[in-house]
Amino acid sequence: MNSTALLDAPATASNGHHAVKTPSRLLGLKCKECGAKYEIAPKHVCELCFGPLEVAYDYDEIARLTSRERITRGPYSMWRYQDFLPVEGEPQVNLEAGFTPLLKCDNLARLLGLRELYIKNDTANPTWSFKDRVVSTALSRAKEFGFTTAACASTGNLANSVAAHAARAGMDCYVFIPSDLEIGKVLNSLVYNPKVVAVEGNYDQVNRLCAEIADRVNRNADGVHENRWAFVNVNLRPFYSEGSKTLAYEVAEQLGWKAPDHVVAPIASGSMLTKIYKGFGEWMDLGLIDRKVVKMSGAQADGCSPVAQAFREKQDFVAPVRPNTIAKSLAIGNPADGIYAKDIAEKTGGAIDSVSDEEIIEGIKLLAQTEGVFTETAGGVTIATLKKLVEAGKIGKDETTVAYITGIGLKTQEAIADHVGKPMQIRPNLASFEEAWGRKF
């Protein structure tokens, strides 16, 4: 069938996608660049200007539906916020992700000289990263569209999450990864028995390949579109990315229905930071929390810092780079939402900075040794950048600050293996322990 742009679109467009009936709180898809509007469908690029599409909501309808009381009666997962997510019915692919701890970090705050510091600890998700939020959203929507195969391009955590959720949903699964990925992340995908395809190239090359496959595999012999493979971060990207808004909703609720003053989040594609910003904004617009400017700061590794570079040099574009960093989950050299993340940081008075691999390792150790949380390299980037921004005076001492920790360190043990102590080797007797300890009881 020909799906048409919504009636009030600035221009019309047609495509071969099968669109489902639009729920009353969803208006459709809208281009972030030219504003063209489309029906709800598995579509991610504007036909008129090739800009990215995102979900548009009927906020009057959401305001009628939602309230603090309705939210608090919901499940203790990300799905307590379903009124704000692009899924029509009950979530069909659900591992109970979300509602992870907001941990008050008094020890780290004292060391950095901050009055009030929290981490949003998304290592507590089902596959130990924030990706469970976006995957649950995307694949629940994919089931509504009638897709039977789940797929993704991934730097690791997304592959783990897609494989797990596909197993839960009874969907076939293909995950495409760079061939140099950490072994922990590869094993954490293989256990769910997906088809894992290791591509000899970096993430950006893997992503381009997946875009080609998505276009080819979802057309029949006559060239007509059919919903076969749901690439969560390609043809399902507008729905997938909305799941990150729950990172804002949870923080606001856990802080007592208020937004923080400042957040620091890692930047890979840039999508997460933009959606955290959108989430706070939606709740302010609907009166669920008081209006304020939340300073949005981003963190990158020096070896893959195109957004930080654009921020520092005040560029109106993000120049692609070739990644070379231990923070492989952030190694996206051509970030799709990088320019939007940069603009948000500038608009809110935040900052985007980058740190060296050595600082990343120290960031991992600092969080572990002060607050007992073992983060992967992306979290090391976040903590090291947090420290750098505080020392530069870009985060105020009295600002309530939240740092987003997006994945667990068990997946990236290689990064720190040579930078921590070794076990004491002793014989099984007290004298041997006293000798190794250097003291006697």
Question: Locations of the language-model features?
Answer:
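PLP-dependent amino-acid enzyme catalytic core
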Residues: 2-441
